[in-house]
Amino acid sequence: MINFINRYGAEIIQRATEHLYLVTVAIFIAISVGIPLGILVTRKPKLKKPILGFANIMQTIPSLALFGLLIPVPVVGGIGDNTAIIALTLYSLLPIIRNTYTGIVGVDPAITQAGIGMGMTDMQLLWQVEIPLALGVILAGVRVATVIAIGLATIAAAIGAGGLGVFIFRGVATVNNQLLLAGAIPAALMALAADFALGFVEARLSKSTLKTINDE
């Protein structure tokens, strides 16, 4: 084991950094797109079915197939990081859109009516009342999306995007369990760390939301 760490330790750190980069960029884009789409659905209910339907379809496509389908797409496709990031972003959209929608429509109508009674515009109501109260639910969606992205990012190695999946594919090709574990264990630890950190923030936000509601 010591010899293995001495031999592959530096590469494990390098691949973990690549893995984290892919996931971080993909989740940032998914948040930037998913939250506005979730808000849009609350304002335009007719768009709920097509938007959530598209996100659901993305979830049903096998991950390796989606990576492969994106390769020949002009501009965004090809071998490397860009294709992997786009694929991870598409997979991350559903929980973020769905939880944003659920969190906002789940705000107590009495609170929103009180805001309307105070003369708030729709935008003021959204930013000062609905989003603050829905943050815990929205973050839960981000949490799920992040864990999913960390797991799926291992497939990115198949299209030359690097990451911890390099060890996994190399281990499968050479029937080497040590290489498999060198990719699988850090990826699992990364997912657990992200889940714990975001879960902690989510719990704090939920407590803050309950306190706000009780104060009202």
Tell me what each language-model feature is.
Residues 37-70, 98-102:
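Cytoplasmic-entry segments and transmembrane alpha-helices of multi-pass inner-membrane transporters
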Residues 123-155, 182, 187, 194:
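Transmembrane alpha-helices
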